[in-house]
Amino acid sequence: MKMVSLIALLVFATGAQAAPIASKAPAHQPTGSDLPPLPAAAPVAPAAQPSAQAVDPASAAPASDAGSASNADAILDNAENAAGVGTDVATVHTYSLQELGAQSALTMRGAAPLQGLQFGIPADQLVTSARLVVSGAMSPNLQPDNSAVTITLNEQYIGTLRPDPTHPAFGPLSFDINPIFFVSGNRLNFNFASGSKGCADPTNGLQWASVSEHSQLQITTIPLPPRRQLARLPQPFFDKTVRQKVVIPFVLAQTFDPEVLKASGIIASWFGQQTDFRGVNFPVFSTIPQTGNAIVVGVADELPAALGRPSVSGPTLMEVANPSDPNGTVLLVTGRDRDEVITASKGIGFGSSALPVASRMDVAPIDVAPRLANDAPSFIPTSRPVRLGELVPVSALQGEGYTPGVLSVPFRVSPDLYTWRDRPYKLNVRFRAPDGPILDVARSHLDVGINNTYLQSYSLREQSSVVDQLLRRVGVGTQNAGVEQHTLTIPPWMVFGQDQLQFYFDAAPLAQPGCRPGPSLIHMSVDPDSTIDLSNAYHITRMPNLAYMASAGYPFTTYADLSRSAVVLPDHPNGTVVSAYLDLMGFMGATTWYPVSGVDIVSADHVSDVADRNLIVLSTLSNSADVSALLANSAYQISDGRLHMGLRSTLSGVWNIFQDPMSVMSNTHPTEVETTLSGGVGAMVEAESPLASGRTVLALLSGDGQGLDNLVQILGQRKNQAKVQGDLVLAHGDDLTSYRSSPLYTVGTVPLWLIPDWYMHNHPFRVIVVGLVGCLLVVAVLVRALFRHAMFRRRQLQEERQKS
């Protein structure tokens, strides 16, 4: 029966045809799509370039190289999945290319003929049909006979776009896609072949083609039967090939139980580590959702009645069917008592690589070594130079074509770095470009930048001396022949929590005599042995600064397991507050790539038990009476269900200017504000802890709880991180307002010899005061010396008079 289903699907697939011009424009794409929006990825070059001619997709033979062979295996696996498909209702998803990651239109030129996007299909879904609807424009200077844009999916031919000089704009054009072409990770490529009269010049700006970012990909899927295997985690809750924001429901029997919440936080941070930049949300329920997947955490005797009473003999992980949805999976994290529940959660957080290919596992006790300061796995070390090959795969440092696009190297650092007199960091760049008479060296260069800020440009090939050329010809050249090497500096202010090095190759082909064509495809790369060196930095900074929290979870992530931090919750938190707590732990896990096994959960009555820790307070204003004392060192107060921001006195203003001279310009908003934080408005306040100097209190507050979730989500959104500044942020949706009013304090240490520089750094008032004091001391010393000299001369004169 399985073979019959497979043959039937293959017969259906071979009958798919490319549709001609669509009869009408595609439907308007809604703002909130149910498909995974993916970040733009570098185009992936197919192993064998397909023909630019328009042919029947069903008759186009796939490439025969190794890449196509592995692709074909994945396609056959996709077809075989059809044998287990039930009669579930199909779901139609609609992507725009912009949702798939295209920041703007995909523009192809002769020097950069390939553009593409990467997207995933969840492993528990099977594609039954798909269609690509494209629109765009092509240069009127292109020759229709030898110019085209070829569309491929996973190296399988989809269709061809040809120019019409009289009508440069095209579309919408519709192409049916054979569903057998889809795999878990897919590559949609647009390959441009240009032709013109006379000699072909790849750098000719008049030869181009553009595909609109509003083009659409429509996919119809049906669910596959669930496979409940712990080894598949994080599936089915999250599929790494689908780069979308993740929603994972949690079911907790009790709204406040410190041990159960700690276990839930460990699991949430592990899922945050897996989702990384995508973000994750954990809605909290008291009962199992009617459909889909969920995670249930609690003691076995307190689990929801719908699950029965599973028999456990210790810490246990178990996957069972959703009682209301046979396609849904419920992950049970349980044990006979609360300590065993925490142990079971560590089985996921620290033992995921050893999870079995089974639906149940008894978890053995796990000993976790304490973390050291600033050793989060996601932060690059500041004790040595770091190779770029340690940060990204070698393939991410390679480019094809004359202008292969930006090669990005993301990295993270603790944002509290400080260097003596703002000494810059060092970046050693090594790169390779083609040898021989291929490139016009005078016009070819590599641009280096960081966080979208330009740093330096270098020629792809420095002029070699005659001796070097002769040695290279006889095969005794230098060991690094063909590798260009340069060292540049990065100002410290350009480096913060989440960073990205950017390399952009811009090569120009060398004009060939007699209209001879040069190579159509060249390879250039940044050497993985290139290094970035932050070893001249020390860990010290001035707080409060919510920008550090938004970019790297600082100061709480100084210890990756949050062992120097505690979370303060109300005595009886509602589901919204608990959900915000889990979302925050997910954010911490995504920031450090480490589970939060060291964090403590306390109520406001037990804050004294964690007085020596950094504190995170999650509360509504109605429940904040017990935690208002924790903001004693801030300029803000909570009383009568309102957040007050008092007007600073003249004396305090002068003192703040002496502490931070930039505070005069940093806050342009009124300093006297009063708000109830209602209607979804949330407040994020940071100040020094009144319980221990050098410790931080971060309070996330909302009038009714609705704003708490929005505050945590803002922390994970890169587009809003730049708006999070100062010591207070008021948030209503994406509308953020920042304030700076509270006194500053220092977190971290530096060597003794660096203390004067740290104390005077960016503080002209301190320099003036020290200068005046120094002048007074010098004058006092001189006056005393002159007085002593005068007294000495007086005695000498008196002695001479007596002798005479």
Swiss-Prot record:
GO biological process: cellulose biosynthetic process; UDP-alpha-D-glucose metabolic process
Presence of keyword Signal: yes
Cytoplasmic side: 788-804
Pfam families xrefs: BcsB (PF03170)
Keywords: c-di-GMP, Cell inner membrane, Cell membrane, Cellulose biosynthesis, Membrane, Signal, Transmembrane, Transmembrane helix
Superkingdom: Bacteria
Coiled coil: none
Subcellular location(s) of the protein: Cell inner membrane
Ranges facing Periplasmic side: 19-766
Keyword Electron transport assigned: no
Primary location: membrane
Bilayer topology: Single-pass type I membrane protein
Record GO cellular component, one term: plasma membrane
Annotated region (Disordered), positions in chain: 24-69
UniProt pathway annotation: Glycan metabolism; bacterial cellulose biosynthesis
Gene3D superfamilies for the chain: Galactose-binding domain-like (2.60.120.260)
Signal peptide bounds: 1-18
InterPro entries with a match to the protein in the record: Cell_synth_B (IPR003920), Cell_synthase_bac (IPR018513)
TM region positions: 767-787
Family from the record: Belongs to the AcsB/BcsB family.
Role this protein plays: Binds the cellulose synthase activator, bis-(3'-5') cyclic diguanylic acid (c-di-GMP).
Description of how the protein assembles with itself and partners: Tightly associated with the cellulose synthase catalytic subunit.
Record-given protein name: Cyclic di-GMP-binding protein
Organism: Komagataeibacter xylinus (Gluconacetobacter xylinus)
The organism's taxonomic lineage, starting at the top: Bacteria, Pseudomonadati, Pseudomonadota, Alphaproteobacteria, Acetobacterales
